[in-house]
Amino acid sequence: MSPAFNASPNQLTLALSKGRIFKETLPLLEAAGIRVMEDPETSRKLILPTSDPAVRVIIVRASDVPTYVQYGAADFGVAGKDVLMEHGMTGLYAPIDLNIARCRMSVAVPAGFDYANAVRQGARLSVATKYVQTAREHFAKKGVHVDLIKLYGSMELGPLVGLSDAIVDLVSTGGTLRANNLVEVEEIVQISSRLVVNQAALKLKRERLTPILDAFEKASAALA
């Protein structure tokens, strides 16, 4: 890590991803008296100042948030449970379910495909997903034989072009599934975003972190 980035031992760095998680984290930050001074949707900056000079926000890919926190490039961050299940929790402490960015991870298939019968018959299914580790564990527990195909987006396209029999993806309203003639057949897990903290930072910067964590916990409890 460069000395310029880690300029002050009192500096707190929060890792966030653009989009829904960023927007839904803003009220929690405001509850802690912290306001982000720039909008990542309009700014090209990846390090954003806040109203607290000792707190800054870095903008990273959602899947990279746990990595930045684990290795200490960020002291804390907000990541979906889906990301944490794939990444693992080494070096991380996840004290708070923030009750934001809620959705579910589910299995979906083309309308008309008899998923239950295929499973009963012991068919080997091809499944396209971004969440390979979680999907592998889910199907293994159910005794379903699958070939997992790693994709990074547009999961719904897999069954439409013959790449896969099914998909495992996040579902919110189900609108995208319906638009692509897919149906949700099995829920794997409910998803929400969690606050994750670097374990070393929790010890070394506890005095600075604790008021923010407490404010996040109180504000998120109101959303439950």
Curated annotation (Swiss-Prot):
Cellular compartment(s): Cytoplasm
GO process annotations (BP): L-histidine biosynthetic process
Keywords, comma-separated and alphabetical: Amino-acid biosynthesis, ATP-binding, Cytoplasm, Glycosyltransferase, Histidine biosynthesis, Nucleotide-binding, Transferase
This protein's GO CC annotations: cytoplasm
Family matches, as InterPro entries: ATP_PRibTrfase_cat, ATP_PRibTrfase_CS, ATP_PRibTrfase_HisG, ATP_PRibTrfase_HisG_short
Reactions accelerated catalytically: 1-(5-phospho-beta-D-ribosyl)-ATP + diphosphate = 5-phospho-alpha-D-ribose 1-diphosphate + ATP
SUPFAM superfamilies the UniProt entry points to: Periplasmic binding protein-like II (SSF53850)
Class in the EC hierarchy, top level: transferase
Gene3D superfamilies in the cross-refs: Periplasmic binding protein-like II (3.40.190.10)
Gene Ontology terms, MF aspect: ATP binding; ATP phosphoribosyltransferase activity
Enzyme Commission code: 2.4.2.17
Pathway assigned to this chain's UniProt record: Amino-acid biosynthesis; L-histidine biosynthesis; L-histidine from 5-phospho-alpha-D-ribose 1-diphosphate: step 1/9
Comment text on domains: Lacks the C-terminal regulatory region which is replaced by HisZ.
PANTHER family linked: ATP PHOSPHORIBOSYLTRANSFERASE, ATP PHOSPHORIBOSYLTRANSFERASE ATP-PRTASE
Subunit structure: Heteromultimer composed of HisG and HisZ subunits.
Family per record: Belongs to the ATP phosphoribosyltransferase family. Short subfamily.
Function description: Catalyzes the condensation of ATP and 5-phosphoribose 1-diphosphate to form N'-(5'-phosphoribosyl)-ATP (PR-ATP). Has a crucial role in the pathway because the rate of histidine biosynthesis seems to be controlled primarily by regulation of HisG enzymatic activity.
Protein known as: ATP phosphoribosyltransferase
Species whose genome carries this gene: Cupriavidus pinatubonensis (strain JMP 134 / LMG 1197) (Cupriavidus necator (strain JMP 134))
Gene behind the chain: hisG
